[in-house]
């Protein structure tokens, strides 16, 4: 490996890691997190939930199979930055159309490779997620720390990634009309709904209950997304107004917002859950599901006791809440991603559950 480093990242605790720049050349302050997935870097880079975050990939080889046109989770990636051990700029894949570096450059996302990703990951695991600054090698540490301190923590992540006006994803022979609240929705969620006979109307995060009801939905979906759920309490208020009227299904941030709508509380995890192999127990069936996860916040289990929500899933690594349900209101949600691709398909049945609830609701209307 070369040793003429030209870029570095500086964490707010003063630690520095040197490497080589790739992608877009820019200095940027982000929150640093890590993901343990072996594959799926394209889906990670294009996941809106990583907005304002710099992701450390723990798997050492990244870029090997390039970028394909069909595997994006959003049209415009908004990840804050990417940190990898070894970057491969010569992909081998008959489907690839661009390199990872080209996609990062096109979307103004800085990357750095050649750093000790294991050491960084241990630091995040032991001390928690922190803010980080990616910059040139000759930037003084004191200047970098000053920039980190003076850069405000963003609270507009959802509004940054949500659509600005409604759009449609239709399928032939559809049976159900679903309105999806876009807090940073992944395209594979929409594909999963389309594949089950749903026409999907995607609306901005700040759409009113009255506007949603004008679409006469059979069900409402609250999407994943970035940031602190308490920054978008408007969506929780929306759930309060619509629960009991329509079946509602939420994923990730949507799960947290549904929980807030029922009076539960959320809190920030020390370093979050990000990877494709998190074991989750279904409390109704006793089965263990291997899940794909990407979140910094979780629902407080104690706060659920005073609500109408019942826990349905728990994480077997730390016993955090992974799913809740209010059968009376036909509302349920999970913290993880049942639509994950690439990733485990153990939880794809949750989309079928949503379909069945909508079917029963239409039959009993």
Language-model regions, residue ranges each:
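RNA-binding accessory domains that recognize and position tRNA/RNA substrates
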Residues: 1-210, 214-215, 229-231, 341, ...
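Proline-centered loop/turn at the N-terminus of a beta-strand
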Residues: 110, 177, 247-249, 265, ...
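Beta-strand-turn-beta hairpins that frame and shape the catalytic cleft
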Residues: 172-178, 285-288, 326-331
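Cysteine-nucleophile active-site neighborhood
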Residues: 214, 219, 224-301, 343-361
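Catalytic beta-strand/loop cores that center a nucleophilic Ser/Cys/Thr
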Residues: 287-329, 365
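A glycine-centered loop/beta-turn motif at secondary-structure junctions
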Residues: 323-365
């Amino acid at each position: 490996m070369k040793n003429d480093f030209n870029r570095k990242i500086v964490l707010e605790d003063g630690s520095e890691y040197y490497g080589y720049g790739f992608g877009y050349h820019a200095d940027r302050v982000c929150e640093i997190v890590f993901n343990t997935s072996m594959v799926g870097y394209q889906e990670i880079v294009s996941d809106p939930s990583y907005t304002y975050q710099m992701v450390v990939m723990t798997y050492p080889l990244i870029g090997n199979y390039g970028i394909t046109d069909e595997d994006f989770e959003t049209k415009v990636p908004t990840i804050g930055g990417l940190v990898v051990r070894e970057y491969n700029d010569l992909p081998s894949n008959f489907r690839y159309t661009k390199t990872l570096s080209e996609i990062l450059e096109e979307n103004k996302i800085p990357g750095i490779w050649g750093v000790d990703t294991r050491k960084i990951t241990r630091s995040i695991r032991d001390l928690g997620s922190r803010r980080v600054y990616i910059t040139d090698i000759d930037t003084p540490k004191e200047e970098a720390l000053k920039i980190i301190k003076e850069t405000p923590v963003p609270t507009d992540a959802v509004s940054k990634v949500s659509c600005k006006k409604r759009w449609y994803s239709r399928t032939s022979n559809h049976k159900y009309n679903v309105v999806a609240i876009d807090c940073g929705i992944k395209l594979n969620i929409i594909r999963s709904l389309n594949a089950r006979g749903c026409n999907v109307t995607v609306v901005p995060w700040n759409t009113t209950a009255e506007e949603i009801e004008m679409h006469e939905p059979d069900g409402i979906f609250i999407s994943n997304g970035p940031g602190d759920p308490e920054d978008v309490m408007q969506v929780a208020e929306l759930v309060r107004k619509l629960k009991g009227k329509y079946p509602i299904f939420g994923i990730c941030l949507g799960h947290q917002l549904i929980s807030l709508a029922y009076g539960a509380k959320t809190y920030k995890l020390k370093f979050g859950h990000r990877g494709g192999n998190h074991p989750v127990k279904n409390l109704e069936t006793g089965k263990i599901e291997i899940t794909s996860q990407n979140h910094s916040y979780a629902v407080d289990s104690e706060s659920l006791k005073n609500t109408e929500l019942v826990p349905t899933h728990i994480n077997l690594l730390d016993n955090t809440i992974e799913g809740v349900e209010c059968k009376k209101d036909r509302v349920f949600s999970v913290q993880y991603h049942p639509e994950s691709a690439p990733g485990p398909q153990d939880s794809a049945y949750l989309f079928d559950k949503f379909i069945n609830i909508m079917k029963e609701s239409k039959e009993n209307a």
